[in-house]
């Protein structure tokens, strides 16, 4: 039987079967034993996204935890290809990464790939992608990272420091490997063929194991890294993978910046949020109130419930009650949507305030913070 979904770094199609994806990608499921181990190490409750399997898969997370317990430590790395506007789905890896940084007190490197975005789309100018980089950096800083343990860098600015290690990586990668991994062809520009070397480079910023929290669609990059890292004297990168926050339009695919009806942007005002949720959020309810009261709704396919479950309602007792009431028909689709609208608007209001404050912190994260200063003095070999 043909697989009815497809996941690559560039697109996600169909309703993703995450158990099948683990087998297809050759990753490991995050087991209850692994969760308990994290809990005992941090001596605290797990993040809601870990408790509820939003982060569900990994490579070498067990080795990262062992290194931490043995006193070797580890570091975090994630990134962002800048776009005109960030949406709620873009924040998931950053919010979870902040939690990891807080709990383990480790360095974090955030790569802003203004170069990749420019090279990938023939219509974009470098000025555009650099402006988007600045705007997106404000949203990232607003998440609340430790300014002295976080280095945010743009590829077009930090390239001199990365270039020696990047060319060593590039020399290890063949065109056929890169082409097969990313679906490139003879019409692909040579910049995008070379680019994977730059995305791999930050995994070698320290002589420790690197942990990358990211959507599972980004996994192919790190397979290439894992093939070559040890030959360059570095660790294979470890990963912890997230599921996709479903688009408003239903359980298939993922949110897209280029399709406004699929996403809530971080800049959406309260009225826009309400309009989008009421109009577009896919419902698991019945066609009439009478039928819904009688038969109940299906939270498994209801986007409003899924957003609350994955992100916006961290209280386990409250989410259980919402699920029970929706399944029984006691809670209507419109009422469920209103719960999400209120949570979303509260979140976005707080984010907007933090984003405004972030304007004063850009230089700290990029140039003047403790880790940033140290990184600008380094040439990575």
UniProtKB/Swiss-Prot annotation:
Localization terms from the record: Cytoplasm
Motif ('KMSKS' region): 254-258
Keywords: Aminoacyl-tRNA synthetase, ATP-binding, Cytoplasm, Ligase, Nucleotide-binding, Protein biosynthesis
InterPro entries: aa-tRNA-synth_Ic, Rossmann-like_a/b/a_fold, Trp-tRNA-ligase, Tryptophan-tRNA-ligase_arc
Substrates-to-products reaction catalysed: tRNA(Trp) + L-tryptophan + ATP = L-tryptophyl-tRNA(Trp) + AMP + diphosphate + H(+)
SUPFAM superfamilies listed in its UniProt record: Nucleotidylyl transferase (SSF52374)
UniProt-listed Gene3D superfamilies: HUPs, Tyrosyl-Transfer RNA Synthetase
Protein name: Tryptophan--tRNA ligase
Organism: Sulfurisphaera tokodaii (strain DSM 16993 / JCM 10545 / NBRC 100140 / 7)
Gene from which the chain derives: trpS
């Amino acid at each position: 039987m043909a697989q009815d979904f497809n996941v690559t770094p560039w697109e996600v199609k169909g309703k993703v079967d995450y158990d099948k994806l683990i087998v297809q990608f050759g990753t490991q499921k995050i087991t209850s034993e692994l969760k308990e181990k994290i809990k005992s190490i941090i001596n605290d409750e797990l993040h809601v996204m870990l408790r509820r399997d939003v982060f569900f898969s990994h490579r070498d997370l067990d080795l990262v935890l062992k290194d931490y317990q043995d006193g070797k430590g580890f570091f975090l790395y994630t990134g962002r290809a800048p776009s005109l506007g960030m949406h709620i789905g873009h924040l998931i890896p950053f919010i979870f990464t902040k939690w990891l940084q807080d709990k383990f007190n480790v360095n974090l490197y955030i790569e802003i790939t203004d170069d990749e975005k420019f090279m990938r789309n023939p219509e974009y100018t470098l000025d555009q992608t650099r402006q988007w980089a600045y705007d997106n950096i404000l949203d990232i800083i607003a998440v609340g990272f430790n300014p002295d343990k976080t280095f945010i860098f743009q590829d077009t600015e930090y390239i001199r420091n990365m270039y020696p290690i990047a060319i060593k990586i590039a020399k290890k990668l063949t065109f056929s490997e890169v082409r097969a991994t990313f679906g490139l062809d003879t019409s692909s520009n040579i910049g995008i063929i070379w680019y994977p070397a730059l995305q791999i480079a930050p995994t070698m910023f320290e002589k420790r194991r690197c942990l990358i929290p990211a959507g599972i669609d980004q996994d192919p990059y790190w397979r290439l890294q894992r093939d070559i890292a040890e030959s360059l004297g570095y660790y294979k990168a470890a990963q912890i993978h997230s599921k996709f926050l479903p688009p408003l339009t239903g359980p298939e695919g993922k949110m897209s910046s280029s399709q406004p009806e699929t996403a809530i942007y971080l800049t959406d005002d309260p009225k826009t949020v309400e309009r989008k949720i009421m109009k577009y959020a896919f419902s698991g309810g019945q066609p009439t109130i009478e039928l819904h009261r009688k038969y109940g709704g299906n939270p498994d396919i209801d986007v409003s419930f899924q957003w609350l479950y994955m992100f916006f309602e961290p209280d386990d007792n409250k989410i259980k009650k919402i699920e029970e009431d929706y399944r029984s028909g006691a809670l209507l689709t419109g009422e469920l949507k209103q719960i999400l609208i209120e949570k979303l608007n509260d979140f976005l209001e707080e984010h907007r305030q933090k984003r405004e404050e972030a304007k004063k912190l850009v230089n700290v994260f990029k140039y003047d913070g403790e880790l940033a200063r140290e990184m600008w003095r380094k040439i990575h070999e």
